[in-house]
Design a protein with these regions (language model features):
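Extended beta-strand/beta-hairpin segments
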Residues: 1-47, 58-138
Length: 138
C-alpha cells in the first residue's frame, strides 16, 4: 500500500498538511525562527509510536475480554546533541488503572504482540534505536 504526505509551506518555519480530514500545522520555536504555531516535527514520531502501540494494546485486550477503564501510553526518549539530532532510544511506559480487574499476564501478552507483531511504527524505529517498555499500575 502506497502512502503519501504533502506539506505546504506557510512562511517562516511553518508547514501545514491535511490528514484524514484533519488540518495539522507544524512549526519551529521562536528561538530558531518559528512562531510556535504548532508542534515541532520530531515529537510526532513519539506520538506515532504511542498511538500505534496504544491502539494495538487496547484492541488486543478488548478481544481478550479485558475491561479497561483507564489507560495511558507515554514515550520517553533522549535526543542526541550532535547533528543530525535524533532520538537515540525509546522507552514506552504503559499505565493502567490498578483497581481494574485486569489479568496482568494478558496485559503483558498484548504488549508483546504489539511490539513484536503489530506496531509498524515500533518496527521501523527498532531498526535505528532501542525500543524498551515497562508496565505501571497506578
Amino acid at each position: 500500500m502506497k502512502a503519501e504526505v504533502e506539506c505546504r509551506w506557510n512562511g517562516g518555519m511553518s508547514f501545514e498538511t491535511e490528514m484524514d480530514g484533519h488540518k495539522i500545522v507544524i512549526d519551529a520555536t521562536p528561538e530558531v525562527g518559528g512562531k510556535g504555531l504548532g508542534p515541532r516535527p520530531k515529537p510526532f514520531m513519539l506520538l506515532a509510536l504511542a498511538g500505534c502501540t496504544g491502539m494495538d494494546v487496547i484492541s488486543i485486550l478488548n478481544k481478550m475480554g479485558q475491561k479497561v477503564s483507564w489507560f495511558n501510553v507515554r514515550v520517553e526518549s533522549e535526543m542526541t546533541e550532535e547533528h543530525p539530532k535524533h532520538y537515540s532510544s525509546y522507552h514506552i511506559v504503559y499505565e493502567f488503572k490498578a483497581s481494574d480487574d485486569l489479568n496482568r499476564k494478558k496485559v503483558d501478552k498484548a504488549i508483546v504482540l504489539s511490539q513484536d507483531r503489530y506496531c509498524g511504527v515500533s518496527e521501523v524505529l527498532k531498526k535505528a534505536s532501542p525500543v524498551t517498555h515497562q508496565v505501571d499500575y497506578i
